[in-house]
Swiss-Prot record:
Region (Disordered): 1-21
Alphabetized Pfam families for the sequence: DUF4732
Protein name from the UniProt record: Putative uncharacterized protein C19orf81 homolog
Length: 196
């Protein structure tokens, strides 16, 4: 009686894709690549499929959000800064008058520190973005009141939002695009630059 001999099959290679033929192993290379990829923590797709996926993800993000604000560092918190987004061309005088209508003597009493205009099309290098008016107040009570009331300019009501919330949203989009760009460059075999 002969002792039973175990076949030389690795647990990873004993998949349905491996075949035993005349004493030698023929291994399905795709299943071996998948199992090796899983064990290395890499995607289980071939490099061409992975590259196509990364490029299509980048292109989709580019179509969805063609103009993303770039940041060299995370934005600092500005809890007393409010923002009004608009496509209308307002002047500083109009915004000040709207503030005075809501808070009489806002500038003279010192409750409003500054009114600043941000042209988002210039910042992002594109067209079609709404501009931002940044209103910095001196206390949280004034901030809360303006957040509730908003501003009325040329008969249209405009809500005010916390500028920190908008900046955080812009920063998240920047990080998302940077990650997709880095993945695309790595898939192409290029070194990602610190341009983003």
């Amino acid at each position: 009686m002969q002792p039973e001999v175990e076949p030389l099959i690795s647990p990873n290679l004993g998949a349905p894709g491996s075949h035993r033929e005349t004493g030698s192993f023929l291994v399905d290379l795709e299943s071996m690549e998948e199992s090796m990829s899983r064990s290395l923590g890499k995607p289980a797709k071939s490099s061409k499929q992975y590259l196509r996926q990364v490029i299509s993800e980048y292109e989709a993000l580019d179509r969805e959000l063609p103009c993303i604000r770039k940041f060299s560092e995370p934005p600092s918190a500005q809890p007393l800064c409010l923002c009004m987004e608009t496509s209308e061309d307002f002047t500083h005088v109009e915004v000040l008058q709207a503030l005075e209508a809501e808070l009489p003597g806002a500038m003279e009493s010192g409750r409003v520190n500054s009114i600043r205009y941000e042209n988002m099309n210039v910042i992002c290098g594109t067209a079609g973005r709404r501009d931002r008016w940044l209103i910095t107040v001196t206390d949280f009570q004034t901030r809360s009141r303006l957040l509730r009331s908003g501003l009325t300019l040329r008969g249209t009501a405009y809500p005010l939002v916390r500028h920190d919330d908008l900046l955080l949203g812009d920063y998240r989009l920047h990080l998302r695009r940077s990650l997709v760009r880095r993945r695309m460059l790595e898939a192409l075999g290029a070194e990602p630059a610190d341009e983003d």
